[in-house]
Design a protein with these regions (language model features):
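Bacterial Sec-dependent N-terminal signal peptides
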Residues: 1-24
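Phosphate-group recognition and catalysis centered on beta-loop-alpha active-site segments
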Residues: 21-273
Length: 273
């Protein structure tokens, strides 16, 4: 047993013995559950939702003719087998490609239409704008304006829809122009004083940090600063339990169904899907 699994097992045992049930964590599917389904496809969101999952993370890009599509990568090569850049092609052109399982590139409108009648949703819309050449400032601002309006118009009354990004430019613009929105700054680092200070400077109340390297003490400090802590990536039930033990408020997973099955053994954890 490696050290991570040992720690997780010990934490689970202690929590179970003590009957702790106060901690609530919101659990959501990364790209719809990218290691269990074809990521970011409509069929993936449908399949995951059918199993009881109402929390999702997804990625939004802009085609050359100004249409929003759902894709983590700028290039279709990994998922569609074609060396094609999304931002350089029209929606009509991009819709001709298929994944190995026959799925087409999903539009934001198609995803929002699927979500419109779902209850208790938590959805992160990641703004994929870090490439400054593809998204210079003027284009970035138009992207943000259009995305905010489209998402908020489609938001069910009881849903939590938030905008996330690694791109400081996008976060800063959105918080400045749309202060009533919900935002999360993503960073490929553990929770730290530096990240807490950056979140304050960006005027966001949520941070998305790496599980690896994050300590419970750091999460406690983030909470003291009024921040909501989301941790990633989640590749296993062990990662989920580690995130719980660290005190995370939100946990993202590539294997949501596997974790949901495992959670049945941990009734002392209050998990919202």
């Amino acid at each position: 047993m490696n050290m991570k699994k040992f720690i997780v097992a010990a934490v689970a045992l202690i929590m179970g013995i003590n009957g702790l049930s106060a901690q609530q964590v919101r659990f959501f599917a990364h790209r719809g559950g990218r290691k269990e389904f074809e990521e970011n496809t409509l069929n993936t969101f449908k399949a995951c939702n059918a199993k009881g999952m109402n929390g999702f993370e997804t990625d939004v890009r802009l085609t050359s003719d100004g249409q929003f599509v759902i894709s983590h990568d700028a290039n279709l090569k990994r998922m569609f087998g074609s060396d094609v850049i999304i931002e350089e092609h029209t929606l009509k052109e991009l819709k001709t490609y298929r994944t190995k399982e026959g799925n087409e590139l999903m539009t934001l409108d198609e995803l929002l239409d699927f979500l419109k009648d779902k209850k208790g949703l938590y959805v992160e819309f990641e703004m994929k704008t870090t490439d400054v050449e593809a998204y210079p400032q003027e284009k970035l601002e138009k992207y943000c304006d259009k995305l905010y309006k489209a998402v908020m118009k489609a938001k069910p009354a009881d849903a939590t829809f938030l905008f996330t990004s690694f791109d400081v430019r996008a976060i800063r613009y959105m918080t400045g122009k749309y202060p009533d929105g919900d935002y999360l700054y993503i960073i490929g680092e553990p929770v730290s004083d530096k990240v807490i200070a950056l979140a304050s400077a960006l005027n966001v109340k949520r941070i998305g940090c790496t599980i690896e390297g994050t300590s419970r003490a750091a999460v406690t400090e983030a909470h003291k600063a009024g921040l909501i802590v989301s941790l990633w990536p989640g590749n296993s039930p062990a990662d989920f339990m580690l995130g719980v033990s660290l005190g995370a408020d939100f946990l993202c997973s590539d294997v949501p169904l596997a974790v949901m099955e495992w959670i049945k053994q941990t009734p002392w954890i209050d998990v919202v899907y």
